[in-house]
Amino acid sequence: MVYVQGGTLMQGSREVTLSDFELGKYPVTQALWEAVMGEGSNPSHFQGPRRPVERVSWYNVVAFCNRLNALVDINQVCYFSDDKCTQPYGLEGELSVAGSVHYKPTLGAFRLPTEAEWEYAAKGGKYQCEVEYAGSDRLRDVAWFTDNSSEESQPIGLLQPNALGLYDLCGNVYEWCWCDFEKKPPDTTTQNAIGVNKILKGGAWISYAKHCQISKYFSNNPFNRHYNYFGFRLARHFTL
């Protein structure tokens, strides 16, 4: 995990203030997915332990975060099926259960980044670099996209990082964010997921350059686990 000092971000005409947080240095790999979810659980089309996991839904990812947290400390579970936050989401059984997901801010808990956190980190955090892509204005230096990917995902960390040392933020796989597409500004605690698209950022191995720009976003159904270019990376609140 990479420390990201908080600050302010302009998203269009809206100023967002962010506290310190941490973001995964890389997208979550297939090796980490299997370590958490169990042997044989890897859903990815393009297989390889150091490739990003793909073909995961937003619901799958929320369940992964909770299971990872439970492995560390059951008290670090942060996603729940009820508004009183007493029923942890996705610790067992089917991973794509319909319903709302409620987030309880929990120090040290792994979670999905918000769209604002993702974009702020991609721009270099406090440095807010004036670049088109995460780390460069030249996309092929920092991202796997339609021009250089050989039409498949690639192992993590092979290209240049951005100013914070984060790899593959643009290209390789789209990354799920916590936020509902319809909520501006986003609700940070409750996600009524039925029929509400979620935001993905960064573009993918299949994307044209314009879709990999930091400012661009995509949205899709939270149940969708069929695309071999949907992945994610972890975030968490910063703790000393």
Regions found by a protein language model. Name each.
Residues 96-105, 141-170, 221-222:
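Short, well-ordered junction/capping motifs at the entry into regular secondary structure
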Residues 2-3, 54, 111-113, 119, ...:
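Structural recognition of the beta-strand scaffold that forms the well-ordered cores
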Residues 28, 39-41, 69, 124-127, ...:
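Acidic glycine-/aspartate-rich tracts in secreted/extracellular proteins
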Residues 9, 48-141, 176:
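Short, well-ordered surface patches within globular domains
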Residues 11-13, 35, 177-189:
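Cytochrome P450 core scaffold surrounding the K-helix E-X-X-R motif
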Residues 1-42, 49-70, 170-171:
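A short glycine-rich, aromatic-capped structural motif
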Residues 160-162, 192-240:
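Disulfide-stabilized, aromatic/cysteine-rich ligand-recognition loop
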Residues 3, 8, 44-45, 52, ...:
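Conserved beta-strand positions that form and line the central face of beta-propeller blades
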